[in-house]
């Protein structure tokens, strides 16, 4: 299904210039050599696969920069899935199986959160699993978003206009409040929120950690649920995570060969959906929110080209002073920055962004990506929130 267009590469190396990983990691050959150049060799002999492709962080900034529309990131991810014979480690299993880890951790969240914050536990994880002890581990919620949603499902069904919410792992296991904030905002626009009948992790962590077959199975399952919402019920699907949105729309057909034809155009980021409704005449009774905020553009948001919608939505909040940070990778790249061997590179990639944030004088940082939030809050002194949360606060 995927046409990576690797033969269209004109060898200009602008992709390497845009690559945050090759800038700080001399062990990574860069997207041109790892992507279209390497693909020509791999097609002749798969034994020419370069293990250094594991250093690609799949940010897609190479694809944004490419003047020939070569899908460089897709080439690299597909090559890793096809040629890499390395058996995934226990560490990579734990980092990538977010539904499993979330389902076993949320019932014991207070204990899990306390334990993973202890220095001896983090040192043990570093020694035994190579999860870097310097990395702050995400906190789990005591109870999932889906469980909470049952208490409001009947109320949500009363609204004439409906959307389906792909909540993702972050909202379900780590931060249900974001899902509650979204419901509050959509209800203020006379729109009810449904959940998909069955939802699994979007699959991005699985792809990144060598579990491509598992990611494909989950994608097929998710597409069935998406089709039920879009084609059967006739309602759009929205997500608060820029990476989940990107995966559902683009990674499924381009990397996993899972057909989402007829669905893709009905899947969008929550901020984009909200802005389109406001632009069409809907209103939100927003109160002043006197905050100085800076917005960080996630890499996959940059790839989709949807930053404008979030920015215009934030500008609707009275009293909000908004500054857009330079578009650059924060460095965490999902599970990449949790790994001991990648931690120094992860922090080096993000260092310019961290400096800009600290020098901004902002009250908080705003972004549409949950892992960017984790990285920014760990690496700076600033709190980081989702734009939907600010809208919910402005509603009072």
Language model region names:
Residues 1, 27-47, 305-313, 347:
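Short, charged low-complexity linear segments at domain edges
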Residues 1-6, 42-53, 187-189, 316-319:
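Short, intrinsically disordered, charge-biased short linear motifs at domain edges
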Residues 3, 8-10, 14-39, 50, ...:
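Iron-sulfur cluster-binding cysteine motifs and their immediate structural context
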Residues 35, 48-49, 185, 327:
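N-proximal short alpha-helices
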Residues 43-47, 61, 93-97:
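A ubiquitous short alpha-helical element
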Residues 72-396:
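Iron-sulfur cluster-binding electron-transfer modules in prokaryotic oxidoreductases
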